[in-house]
Design a protein with these regions (language model features):
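Gly/Ser/Thr-rich active-site cleft segment
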Residues: 10-12, 23, 99, 124-193
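N-terminal glycine/serine-rich phosphate-binding loop of ATP-dependent small-molecule kinases
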Residues: 1-99, 154
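Gly-rich Lys/Arg/Thr-decorated short loops/hinges at beta-loop-alpha junctions or inter-strand turns
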Residues: 35-45, 120-125, 174-181
Length: 193
């Protein structure tokens, strides 16, 4: 019988896997801190190391299962959460090619550029997505275009960190609406990009 639920949270400072019973009681938790590395070429950058951080995330899952001695077959569902506005870019084959944490601050010039291009755009995007430029993906994607054109040209898909966790667990890259809207690219009313 499936008597447990698992949550995997990709937070700003750490990743954790938490196991609950069906009444919501916490049965076990495993957590690992991760770091976001500044690229010395780009002050304010906070790169996300998806290879190493996947080792940490999957290690949390293994650890909580080992500590609680719960058979994975007894888990009814897994949910993921994350730091909002941390983004990953993928190539056409679904490979991660670039990622940054939500605290990445390298796109200040791009925010200014967007405001110069269209002073009303931020308000228009806010009305549709509920997001401003502050931590939004649009200035970061523009930053990649301006500073890493080879990565920009290879980019076929974008996702947030909990989407990445789901992708790593299932092989399916999908974005759920509440997180997709944090990109500033999803209209919450129409659920269209």
């Amino acid at each position: 019988m499936k008597n447990y639920l698992m949550a995997i949270d990709a937070g700003t400072g750490s990743v954790r896997a938490v196991l609950f019973d069906l009444k919501g009681n916490q049965i076990g938790c495993s957590q690992h801190e991760w770091t976001h590395n500044e690229d010395p070429r780009f002050p304010g950058s906070m790169d996300f190391d998806w290879k190493y951080n996947w080792e940490l995330a999957s290690g949390c899952v293994r650890n909580v299962l080992a500590e609680t001695k719960i058979d994975p077959a007894e888990i009814a569902a897994i949910s993921t959460t994350c730091m909002r506005e941390g983004i990953l870019l993928y190539d056409k084959d679904g490979n991660e090619i670039w990622a940054c944490a939500n605290v990445d601050a390298r796109s200040n010039d791009e925010v200014a550029e967007l405001i110069r291009m269209n002073p009303d755009l931020e308000l228009e995007l806010y009305k549709k997505s509920g997001q401003s430029y502050a931590l939004n993906a649009i200035p970061r994607i523009l930053w990649v275009k301006n500073n890493m054109p080879d990565i920009y040209e290879k980019t076929a898909k974008i996702g947030m960190f909990n989407d990445w966790l789901i992708y790593k667990l299932t092989g399916v890259l999908a974005v759920e609406p509440s997180n997709g809207s944090t990109t500033g690219l999803l209209d919450l009313q129409t659920r269209t990009w």
